[in-house]
Amino acid sequence: MSASHFAKQDSAPVNPHGTGRLSRREFLAASGALLALACTGSLGAGQAHAGTRYASFASESSEPTPTLSDETYRRVSFSAVGDNLMNYPVVEAADANAGTTGDGWFDFTPMYQGVGDIVSSHDLNFIDIETILGGDDLGLSGYPVFNSPSCLAEQITGYGWNLCTTATNHTLDMGLTGILNSCATWAAQTNMLMTGSFSSQEDRDRIRTCERNGMTFAFLSYADDFNGIPIPSEAPWCVAQAGDDAMTSDVTRAKEVADVVIVAMSWGSEYEHSPNDLQRHYAQHLANLGVDLIVGFGPHVIQPIEWYYGYDNDGNPTGTSTLVVFSLGNFLSNQPYSYANVEGCFTCEFERLGTKGRATITNLAWTPLVNHISSGWHQVFKLKDYTDDLAATHESIGLESDPRGYCYNLTQQVIGPSGVYIDW
């Protein structure tokens, strides 16, 4: 067992597919009506049998997959959180959580307990792995060139996240060696579907898919910037760089094998609550390609949720629409700005009757989160569980005149106009 293993014992647009705003009672009832999971394949992220272009992962359940008829109603629930950003104070706190400090053991799991019920109650759970797990033997490091403990992969997967991206502006922080180490680390997690960085051209060409309740999901990811670090010339395949041509090729292949295509995007201007022109360009391009959902991150702050409509090359409407969550904000981090610690968890459901036609996205909701930082204590809380007394102790939010009110007002200002249900 590695010495870095975890502890010895983180006006509103109308939804063209369905209901955009629900009462809390309706939303919770819908979220509670989760159907059994069914997952195909036995391969870890980044692994596949020789010759295949697709990678998938298996469910922990040994129950047989139920037979679904063409008239079966299918529903799959989804959640997404933002940047798992391993600033070194967060790593030091995980070291302390594990017991004796400096012994190479880390426990990040207490930091995530505020969202445990969300993760456990949804079929697909996405998290952005903002900083590379480049291999502990390269030395752990924080800002500005990160290398995070490899045990994070096991702890995050064990906590219930099963979709992650490693395509961020920090992917190249440890060079090609770090990427190859990261790919091997994530490939060992059999219930995690990772994409965004790759171990070979063959690996880059594989479309990651998983099946839930009779629907097949494809998962793609891109980053638009690597902090000025060039992609290694000998390994142009090692990370998915955003670009119209690459996206067109990947989405076209993904739609051949999946009912739903989800794209994760590392993009945006740092600390800006409004999407920039490049974000909007890529959102429209992906909408034109027929992507179902885009989940964004990178600015370290929350940004709006909007619907985009698809058009063909002649400018004619295709009749499809794409939901764009421009930025989920940070998730777990140590950034010293109030606005960088107000974040969210986006949830929705994918629904379809039978095997034909496009899945619809329903029951859109946003659970406001706060990344709490206080005297070495790091933990994510739901805003509705975040008391005034606790908010007053936050190292940055606590300096606001009304700490908890600040979190509420910022969420309302940015997410409120989107028209999604906010779970206050």
Where are these regions (language model features)?
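N-terminal secretory signal peptides
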Residues: M1-L22, A30-G41, H49
